[in-house]
A protein has these predicted regions:
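Low-complexity, small/basic-enriched stretches
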Residues: 1-76, 144-170
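Short amphipathic alpha-helical boundary/capping segments
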Residues: 80-86
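Short, leucine-enriched amphipathic alpha-helices that occur as contiguous helical runs
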Residues: 86, 90-94, 121
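Short helix/strand-capping hinge loops at secondary-structure junctions
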Residues: 100-103
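Alpha-helical residues within the helix-turn-helix
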Residues: 113
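Major-groove DNA-recognition helix of helix-turn-helix-type DNA-binding domains
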Residues: 136
Length: 170
């Protein structure tokens, strides 16, 4: 039997998220109103050579539980297994994002330097924009070199809310 991509919706305080799992791993946590959401779903279908089915899975239920804890300010790290789908460069950038600690921020320039490509700031920004696993791969922690909030798939309001959640002391 072919594996399918299970898909569910999660309603967060910052907006609606689309969650998807494949082979017992989370492969999507994207904002429903993200202009690139459909592109991210198509990339998964094409790469995994399968289709979506609106059905839950143990991974999706655990993701929802951990997101609930995160939004309540009771979770600083996620333990969900991830299935990343992207180019080698995107995977390199996303793995670097996973190193950004809860409550911390970094810049696109710092990410480029950390992966050994200091002149690839725009390419890094593009890879971050293609991240289909928001929050768990914390692209919201990337800000401008001047400390300004810059683009985010969930919108700047959601980005600000996520950063505020992470800077509250509990």
């Amino acid at each position: 039997m072919d594996k399918i991509i299970n898909i569910q919706h999660y309603f967060s305080p910052c907006g609606e998220l689309v969650l998807a799992s494949y082979a017992d791993k989370l492969c999507l946590c994207d904002w429903s109103d993200n202009p690139c959401a459909e592109r991210n779903k198509l990339r998964l279908e094409r790469y995994l050579k399968t289709s979506f089915k609106t059905e839950t899975s143990s991974v999706l239920e655990e993701t929802k539980r951990q997101l609930d804890e995160y939004f309540a300010g009771n979770r600083k790290a996620f333990t969900i297994p991830l299935h990343l789908v992207g180019t080698d460069f995107q995977l390199q950038v996303w793995n670097e994002l996973l190193k950004i600690l809860y409550g911390a921020t970094t810049s696109y320039k710092e990410i480029a330097q950390n992966i050994g490509k200091p002149k690839a700031v725009r390419a890094v920004a593009g890879a971050i924009g293609a991240n289909g696993i928001s929050i768990l791969i914390p692209c919201h922690r990337v800000i401008g070199s001047d400390k300004s909030l810059t683009g985010y798939a969930g919108g700047l309001k959601a980005k600000k809310m996520l950063l505020q959640i992470e800077t509250q002391i509990k």
